[in-house]
Amino acid sequence: MLETKRLILRPFLESDASDLFEYLEKPAVNCFASMKINSLEEAKSESLKRAKNTEFYFAIVLKETGKVIGEIDAYPDRTEPGESDTPPDTFSPCWMLNEDYQKKGYAFEAAYAFFDYLFSKKGARRIYAYTEDYNFSSQHLCEKLGMRREGLFMEFVSFVKNPDGTPLYENTMQYAILKKEWDAQKAINK
């Protein structure tokens, strides 16, 4: 469990289903389209799935009310093929917030604590994130976290279909930060 001034980042519980349903009933960006939930029963099942991953998957919870307003997770990425015994040192995070709680600094607060957790407790050497070229909020968040833009992948991935059924390919930006950059940034901001 991680704690910030206004938030608690903790593993999901089955009782988080209604809050999960609230923000996954209509995902805000295409990359979350496959996570769409159609019923409270489906949300309960998804809450239980998320609850099984307690190391890298957290509910973002308002301290004041206990309401789940989003989630943040990371996918460990092995840098060398065949090193299954070696702990990963590269992570790709993903964050999603209920639209009613966006633009209030919660995403930054959660991501900052989560990045610090990955760097200080999980041995991260590098963290990288993908965001669509139209998702200016996520781009701004990456930059605020001290991540540098590393590239733009044209027509990189398709999450949804065009009206004619063909894939709608989206342009994707990659941002990243190294542990030494994170540590230097933290030292300056002390």
Region roles according to the model:
Residues 13-15, 47-50:
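Short linear motifs in intrinsically disordered
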Residues 28-49:
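Conserved GNAT-fold acetyl-CoA-binding loop/helix
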Residues 43-44, 53-56, 161-163, 173:
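Short, intrinsically disordered/low-complexity patches at protein termini
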Residues 1-27, 31, 61-190:
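Acyl-donor (CoA/ACP) binding surface of acyl/acetyltransferases
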Residues 48-59, 70:
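A short helix-loop-beta-strand connector motif used in the catalytic cores of GNAT acetyltransferases and
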